[in-house]
Amino acid sequence: MKTEANYMQLCLGTVQFGLDYGITGQKKPPQEYAVECLDYATQNGILAIDTAAAYGTAEEVVGTFLAKKTIPRNKLFISTKLLHNILDECPPEDYKRVIQESLYRSLRRLHLDYI
């Protein structure tokens, strides 16, 4: 599926929603606050959201937001990333399977059918 959002001027990074640093100092914000931030950002034209499996619970937070919102999916640009060391202990013949499994886990956490 292709998103209608081909070019974004701003992208909201979500590492601060899932790890213990960022917008609240030394700890992650409550999920309700993070969802409010996502809602505010999207209502004000920030339709690109960046997250990652390595960002603690950030994918789950984004998923909670996306499950509650009525904004059309094709208006959003959601990006995520694999863990940096996902293939370290993996033989090359398993790369495809390991990457696919990781992406499917991200899709479940994000409540999406594509990224």
Regions found by a protein language model. Give the residues of each.
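N-terminal binding-site loop/beta-alpha segment at the start of enzyme catalytic domains
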Residues: M1-L76
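Active-site mouth loops of central-metabolism enzymes
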Residues: G18-E32, L82-Q100
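Glycine/proline-rich, positively charged
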Residues: Q43, C90-I115
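Hydrophobic residues in well-ordered beta-strands that form the structural core
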Residues: I78-T80
